């Protein structure tokens, strides 16, 4: 096989390769076997026409396209290996020469993985974050748990305050006319929750059960309903009932209500402290990793082909559709509810995709610069982890992973991240 790679502008180049006569003959033979199965020729049973008769009747050229379809995956793969290039998309292959009895010559305009010019990636400064759980953090968590056990009790002859829950009727009017979506009866609203437009909840503070009021407001300029955005309106409201939170005492009894596995408040505090400490350490480690990766990526230079970004955006769109499906929705319903289009969503995904692509390219380049190669022990350990996670036999996991290229790439990237973290300087 003759292969020629001509680098052009950016990440694109022209790949010229051929299929030698002997290989062409093999492809034609395989194509004839495929075509003959469905061929009807008078005087012969279906699928039994001899090759010579086929050539006389249709010409050998009738097999060329099928032969090319059969041979192309193999010869293209061989050509890119010999050229030493790493394509990032499937190119359009053009036929330069396809003469009977001669070598076939093909060309393809190929977009390849870009070269990464690494900047500083070792000894990067990162923020020193506190990992020790504070008393304030523990108390805040206990307070949240305490408030979750609170009960709402009716407030008798007392004005509504922030934090109270009111039961009310309301109807909104613009220029004296009720507008769509502005009416409800016996609606439950926690004051201070920010569920309504600015000013609505604040003007309910101080009212008592049985009170009626007209609340004058202006919708925010960025409100989603264009006919109401920035417009003055009046809400007629009537309060039926006010409820306040009755928070239980933080004691042993409450501790047992919160967690049936503990007997005392001290036991609950110890259990929560351990959980919060682990979560904080994990959060700090994640923040450090994200910061050091972001700095290494920022310091690197790379011209990312749009094909890579588009492919990654497609991948993100597929994940998005799967997440919606898990919630019982479809992309079509989501677009209908939100007023967004698939094209706009894909464009939004491309922004995230470009960041992800650059990050992966930089981490791969760091792995290469550090001569990182996963050991057989590391590969076997990862396979064991996957087998346990998905309840599969190790051999089944190996079979599913195929040539292990994706697994090896993941392990390389993890090791590259370790290089960044191990050399990072906390300040």
Curated annotation (Swiss-Prot):
It is found in: Cytoplasm. It comes from the Bacteria. Belongs to the FKBP-type PPIase family. Tig subfamily. Pfam families: FKBP_C, Trigger_C, Trigger_N. Residues 163-248 form the PPIase FKBP-type domain. It catalyses: [protein]-peptidylproline (omega=180) = [protein]-peptidylproline (omega=0). Consists of 3 domains; the N-terminus binds the ribosome, the middle domain has PPIase activity, while the C-terminus has intrinsic chaperone activity on its own. GO terms for molecular function: peptidyl-prolyl cis-trans isomerase activity; protein folding chaperone; ribosome binding. This is Trigger factor. Keywords: Cell cycle, Cell division, Chaperone, Cytoplasm, Isomerase, Rotamase. GO terms for biological process: 'de novo' cotranslational protein folding; cell division; chaperone-mediated protein folding; protein transport; protein unfolding. One of its GO terms (cellular component) is cytoplasm. It comes from Listeria welshimeri serovar 6b (strain ATCC 35897 / DSM 20650 / CCUG 15529 / CIP 8149 / NCTC 11857 / SLCC 5334 / V8). Involved in protein export. Acts as a chaperone by maintaining the newly synthesized protein in an open conformation. Functions as a peptidyl-prolyl cis-trans isomerase.
């Amino acid at each position: 096989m003759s292969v020629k790679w001509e680098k052009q502008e950016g990440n694109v180049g022209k790949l010229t390769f051929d299929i030698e006569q002997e290989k062409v003959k093999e492809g034609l033979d395989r194509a004839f076997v495929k075509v003959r199965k469905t061929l009807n020729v008078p005087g012969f049973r279906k699928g039994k026409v001899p090759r010579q008769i086929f050539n006389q009747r249709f010409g050998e050229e009738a097999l060329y396209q099928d032969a090319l379809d059969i041979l192309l995956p193999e010869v293209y793969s061989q050509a890119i290996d010999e050229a030493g290039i790493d394509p990032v998309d499937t190119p359009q292959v053009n036929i330069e020469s396809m003469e009977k009895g001669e070598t076939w010559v093909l060309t393809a305009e190929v977009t390849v993985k870009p070269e990464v010019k690494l900047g500083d990636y070792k000894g990067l400064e990162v923020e020193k974050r506190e990992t020790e759980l504070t008393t304030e953090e523990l108390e805040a968590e206990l307070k949240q748990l305490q408030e979750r056990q609170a009960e709402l009790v009716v407030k008798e002859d007392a004005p509504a305050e922030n934090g109270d829950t009111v039961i009310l009727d309301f109807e909104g009017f613009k220029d004296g006319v009720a507008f769509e979506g502005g009416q409800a009866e016996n609606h439950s609203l926690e004051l201070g929750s920010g569920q309504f437009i600015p000013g609505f909840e604040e003007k309910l503070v101080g009212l008592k059960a049985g009170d009626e009021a007209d609340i004058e407001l202006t919708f925010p300029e960025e409100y989603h309903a264009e006919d109401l955005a920035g417009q003055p309106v009046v809400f007629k409201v009537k309060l039926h009932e006010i409820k306040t939170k009755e928070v239980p005492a933080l004691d042993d009894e409450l501790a047992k209500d919160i967690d049936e596995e503990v007997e005392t408040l001290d036991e609950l505090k110890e259990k929560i402290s351990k959980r919060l400490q682990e979560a904080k350490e994990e959060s700090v480690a994640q923040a450090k990793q994200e910061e050091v990766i972001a700095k290494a990526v920022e310091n690197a230079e790379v011209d990312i082909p749009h094909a890579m970004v588009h492919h990654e955006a497609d991948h993100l769109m597929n994940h998005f559709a799967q997440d919606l499906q898990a919630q019982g929705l479809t992309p079509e319903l989501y677009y209908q509810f939100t007023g967004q289009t698939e094209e706009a969503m894909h464009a939004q995904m491309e922004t995230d995709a470009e960041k992800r692509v650059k990050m992966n390219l930089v981490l791969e380049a760091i792995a290469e610069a550090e001569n990182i190669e996963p050991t057989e022990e590391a590969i076997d350990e990862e396979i064991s982890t996957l087998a346990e996670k998905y309840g599969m036999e190790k051999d089944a996991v190996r079979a599913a992973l195929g040539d292990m290229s994706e697994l090896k790439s993941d392990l390389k990237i993890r090791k590259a991240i370790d290089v960044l973290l191990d050399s990072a300087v906390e300040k």
